[in-house]
Amino acid sequence: EKMEEKRFIFISYIELAKYLKDKEETVMKNTIDDMINQCKDFGFTDIILQVRSFSDAIYYSDIFPSSITIVSKEGDKLPFDVLDYFIKMSHKNNIRLHAWINPYRIRSNLSKAEIKDNNPAFKYLNTNKVEKNAKGIFYNPADEEIRKLILSGVDEILDNYDIDGIHYDDYFYPSDTIDLENYNEAKKDNQDLTLQQFRLENTTKLIKETYERVKKKNKNILFGISPEGNITNNYEVNYIDTKKFASEEGYVDYLMPQIYFGFFNSVKPFYQTVKEWNSYITTDKVKLIPALAFYKVGCEDLYAKDGQYEWVESNNIIAREVLTSRPLSNYQGFAIFRYDSILSDNLTDQAFKEKENLKNILKE
């Protein structure tokens, strides 16, 4: 029996701000209808929609303020429940809808938006539960109260929406300094505890508890993460124990590594990297769904060394990435990052060709 290939597309806060922010309700709804139709026409089966990008919400929440990606000012009244509308229209079109949450980010370094008392981060601003650094403002992953806050946000979605999945992206550990106080405290109980162990344990707790909440609600709802494609960075920068999640049941239903590399990338050539990820999965409870970098089409890839011009010179990289991934033992589908790169109506000729080449192999 042939397994259905899942075809995911990310709709990020960047698309939401571009297409929906500050528009009239009817315009917003028509735009959402159009986006979902585009996804359906292309053949996407699953949408990963960013519902919380900055300690906020694109839905009616009692915990988080409305998102600046939809309204002019954080906390302004949402014209309607954007998540609810996306779910209804997706289901009407036989597309599954996953709520994508950025668990730790409160602000990016580009954001000048003030944090007011309607944001749960407000009361933690001068504590070690929150850190302001060069990348932005972030919740501390080592803090128990913060973990409870993130989980209560997940529960709120599970309780109020007919969601098909919960998804976390790759922004795990925000910095090298955010949790040092907590670490020193933890070392009093265990002298041998390394900082790396401590950090991996903190994110693992969040992942495990999220999985448990999701499955308690409904075992058919999926939970997965999209860690960075470079495994080393997951252990040394993001502190996320991807090998554990790949080999043991009870953490994730799927891993969606961001394998944002071409075939000639000197550091992480695509095929070798996707095979490496596949080899870590040793339980049939976990599936592999590589995320692919459609946003790189037509661009120079500065860190790819030998593959620097690959995305400029070729127009069928994404299609070939899908074709080479399909035979892998744990493969269940692919994901495209992101909507605007593949479905906007002003694609470059090259992106259009890349898109057509991908579409052609979906008919098979």
Spans of model-derived segments:
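Glycine-rich, aromatic-flanked loop segments that form ligand/cofactor-binding clefts
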Residues: 44-52, 79-131, 167-169
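The substrate-binding groove and active-site-proximal loops of carbohydrate-active enzymes
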Residues: 14-26, 64-80, 133-151, 192-202, ...
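Polysaccharide-binding and catalytic clefts of secreted carbohydrate-active enzymes
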Residues: 28, 84, 119-248, 260-261
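Substrate-binding cleft of secreted/luminal carbohydrate-active enzymes
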Residues: 249-267, 276-364
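Catalytic domains of carbohydrate-active enzymes, especially glycoside hydrolases
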Residues: 30-57, 160-165, 248-254, 325-334
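Active-site-adjacent "subsite" loops/lids of carbohydrate-active enzymes
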Residues: 4-29, 98-99, 104-160, 305-309
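Alpha-helical scaffolding within the catalytic cores
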Residues: 208, 231-244, 267-281, 317-322
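Aromatic-lined substrate-binding rim segments of carbohydrate-active enzymes
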Residues: 35-36, 49-102, 188-217, 269
